[in-house]
Curated annotation (Swiss-Prot):
Pathway: Fermentation; pyruvate fermentation to lactate; (S)-lactate from pyruvate: step 1/1. Belongs to the LDH/MDH superfamily. LDH family. Keywords: Cytoplasm, NAD, Oxidoreductase. InterPro entries: L-lactate/malate_DH, L-lactate_DH, L-lactate_DH_AS, Lactate/malate_DH_C, Lactate/malate_DH_N, Lactate_DH/Glyco_Ohase_4_C, NAD(P)-bd_dom_sf. GO terms for molecular function: L-lactate dehydrogenase activity. This is L-lactate dehydrogenase C chain.
Length: 332
């Protein structure tokens, strides 16, 4: 006797086995799931894979999404502990990593996350050798270097989420101060995604009018309007959210999805993301920091050489030195 499916449906052509635009998110914690839902709501992928070592948490999160399939345009969501589920991904987003425990040094946390990357990256590359990898796990700049080293991928294919969010916070806060939508506020935060990030005040502009031309002291200690507090709010913003709700998730997820769209849709938009800066601004070490990068299907296709003033360049090099002093002691 025929099954209900056999009586109802007549097949005309075989299904395509391979997705055209598959994204994998590694890590189903708060950031990973915020990235997943943001990607799904933007309709960036025709297949989304979730990978995590915690099978119960993974299954629960995946089922919760699958039960909402009717409301999503992504036809396929898969999940598993094994990296075979990520096979043939165009983009792999790594959000998994250890959290700092009380009394732990930054270097000790970093070393634990290096161990995590050593466990994650080989499985990713084995199943998706031509993928682009985006690192979100902190400290993102050094871990982008680590993933580049472990993966063997070209530098253009390994991208850190970097200062894309810092720059977005910067533009939002400038907009709040001026009463202008952040999309019309143009400015960059570069260097480390963290305390030593560098606001490029010399280039901040609205409709081509640089704020420095109106206030030459902008961003400095002598600025009577104290615009430098804007950058302080950028640096403190993540900590404030962390203290209030226990973690950050939505802003970083929206930032990650914005970067992913530029890569997967070949948009050639410019983002402040983490990449190799050796050879720029006199830097001789293999350091990864955020600079403006053009993103497309090949990953990072071009670098934008920012004309920093003397003070900004000095701060950028200081940011580089801070990271190098940590990175040089890493055991890979």
């Amino acid at each position: 006797m025929s099954t209900v499916k056999e009586q109802l449906i007549q097949n005309l052509a075989p299904d395509e086995k391979q997705s055209r635009c598959k994204i994998t998110v590694v890590g189903v914690g708060n950031v990973g799931m915020a990235c997943a839902i943001s990607i799904l709501l933007k309709g960036l992928a025709d297949e989304l894979a979730l990978v995590d070592a915690d099978e119960n948490k993974l299954k629960g999160e995946a089922l919760d999404l699958l039960h909402g399939s009717l409301f999503l345009s992504t036809p396929k969501i898969v999940f598993g502990k094994d990296y075979s589920v990520s096979a043939n991904s165009k983009l792999v987003i790594i959000t998994a990593g250890a959290r700092m425990v009380s009394g732990e040094s930054r270097l000790a946390l970093l070393q634990r996350n290096v161990t995590s990357m050593k466990a994650i990256v080989p499985g990713v590359i084995q199943n998706s050798p031509d993928c682009k990898i985006m690192i979100v796990t902190n400290p993102v700049d050094i871990l982008t270097y680590v993933v580049w080293k472990i993966s063997g991928l070209p530098v253009s294919s390994v991208i850190g989420s970097g200062c894309n969010l810092d720059s977005a916070r910067f533009r939002y806060l400038i907009g709040e101060k001026l009463g202008v939508n952040p999309s019309s506020c143009h400015g960059w935060v570069l260097g480390e995604h963290g305390d030593s990030s560098v606001p490029i005040w010399s280039g901040v502009n609205i409709a081509g009018v640089t704020l420095k031309s109106l206030n030459p002291a902008i961003g400095s200690d002598s600025d009577k309007e104290q615009w430098k507090t804007v950058h302080k709010q950028v640096v403190d913003g993540g900590y404030e959210v962390l203290n209030l709700k226990g973690y950050t998730s939505w802003a970083i997820a929206l930032s990650v999805t914005d970067i992913a769209a530029s890569i997967l849709k070949n948009l050639k938009r410019v983002h402040a993301v983490t990449t190799l800066v050796k050879g720029l601004y006199g830097i001789k070490e293999e350091i990864f920091l955020s600079i403006p990068c053009v993103l497309g299907q090949s990953g990072i296709t071009d670098l934008v050489k920012v004309n920093m003033n003397t003070e900004e360049e000095a701060l950028f090099k200081k940011s580089c030195d801070i990271l190098w002093n940590i990175q040089k002691d890493l055991q890979l």
